[in-house]
Amino acid sequence: MLYFLAEHLAKLEFLKSIYLRAFLGFVISFCIVLFAGRPFIKYLKIKKFGEEIRDDGPSSHFSKKGTPTMGGVLIIAAVLLTSIFINDLTNSLILLVLLSTIMFAAIGFIDDYRKFTVSKKGLAGKKKLLFQGAIGLIIWAYIYFIGLTGRPMVDLSLINPISAYPYYIGAIGLFFLIQIVLMGTSNAVNITDGLDGLAIMPMIICSTILGVIAYFTGHTELSSHLHLFYTVGSGELSVFLSAVTGAGLGFLWYNCYPAQIFMGDTGSLTLGGILGVIAIILKQELMLPIMGFIFVLEALSVILQVGSFKLRGKRIFKMAPIHHHFELMGIPESKVTMRFWIGTLIFGIIALGAIKMRGIL
């Protein structure tokens, strides 16, 4: 809407600035979540959409029972409303991301809603993967039939995060890469969302870093200087991601310890999906695990725990995901969360540093 006005009114030409719209996107989405947060929490309490706590979890978590969940509805609503207002809606990349966001949100919402109306287990795991796979198919079809960079060799390649060298993997290889990235990221963020504020801050950091990369890849000179693959219109993604960052920070206001609300699968699956989709568009599939190392660590801890128990009958950790392991070691929840935040910040800096190293190694 704002971009449309700038296109048709000469006096508002300045509103086309990516810097200005990114700033506005951050502020608007932050304010929406911040000011709508209290009444939304009150509404969820009235509807009794409260968190269920696993019986075998840390005893300190029993006090969280009944804490409103489905806060992801507020986050995603703020992001979508802000994006519609400030983004260029004729940009095909933005439309692709908006469509993906809505589809991931639908999966998460159905999962959350079923937990209160049908079964505490929510949507079956196989159905989740099936729906996530369908989103991956749409992303793959777009890249294969339309393209991103205008260079098929790049579009159908896996990019080395350090040297920026493209390894051609073809259409079939790209299909499986997209499925792994989308399912992996979406579910990893979901797994991480187990402590107050634990998932949202790493999400904010990763969103900010991807926003910076999106701006670089949409700029001919900067992308060339940093050995990134120029993608027409990707600068708009930095505007979208600023809205994600703002909404995330607004949510943290209520989600930090002790949490007044949880994001639920509506939030975690969708936010993880957004990271995955944009990383694919920007050809940063291998950079994402670096900046999102905490998400990778959490997912790996679950995989290793389940695998070890099935193969050896023994557990590696006191409890998985690994944040519960640290809790059972006697480390306070707030300290575990803060240390994970610090770890994400460190790996985020490493990811940005890796971009600068391109062309040197």
Curated annotation (Swiss-Prot):
Using the UniProt record, name the top-level EC class of this enzyme in a single word: transferase
Q: What does the function comment of this entry state? A: Catalyzes the initial step of the lipid cycle reactions in the biosynthesis of the cell wall peptidoglycan: transfers peptidoglycan precursor phospho-MurNAc-pentapeptide from UDP-MurNAc-pentapeptide onto the lipid carrier undecaprenyl phosphate, yielding undecaprenyl-pyrophosphoryl-MurNAc-pentapeptide, known as lipid I.
Q: In which pathway does it act?
A: Cell wall biogenesis; peptidoglycan biosynthesis
Its cofactor is:
Mg(2+)
Q: Which GO terms describe its cellular component?
A: plasma membrane
Enzyme Commission code(s) on record: 2.7.8.13
Q: Which family does it belong to?
A: Belongs to the glycosyltransferase 4 family. MraY subfamily.
Q: Mind listing the GO biological process terms from this record? A: cell division; cell wall macromolecule biosynthetic process; cell wall organization; peptidoglycan biosynthetic process; regulation of cell shape
Query: What does the record give as the reaction this protein catalyses?
Result: UDP-N-acetyl-alpha-D-muramoyl-L-alanyl-gamma-D-glutamyl-meso-2,6-diaminopimeloyl-D-alanyl-D-alanine + di-trans,octa-cis-undecaprenyl phosphate = di-trans,octa-cis-undecaprenyl diphospho-N-acetyl-alpha-D-muramoyl-L-alanyl-D-glutamyl-meso-2,6-diaminopimeloyl-D-alanyl-D-alanine + UMP
Which keywords appear in this protein's UniProt record, sorted alphabetically? Cell cycle, Cell division, Cell inner membrane, Cell membrane, Cell shape, Cell wall biogenesis/degradation, Magnesium, Membrane, Metal-binding, Peptidoglycan synthesis, Transferase, Transmembrane, Transmembrane helix
Record field: transmembrane: 17-37, 66-86, 90-110, 129-149, 162-182, 197-217, 232-252, 261-281, 286-306, 340-360
Location relative to the cell: Cell inner membrane
Which GO MF terms are attached to this record? metal ion binding; phospho-N-acetylmuramoyl-pentapeptide-transferase activity; phosphotransferase activity, for other substituted phosphate groups; UDP-N-acetylmuramoyl-L-alanyl-D-glutamyl-meso-2,6-diaminopimelyl-D-alanyl-D-alanine:undecaprenyl-phosphate transferase activity
Q: How does this protein sit in the membrane?
A: Multi-pass membrane protein
- Name used for this protein in its record: Phospho-N-acetylmuramoyl-pentapeptide-transferase
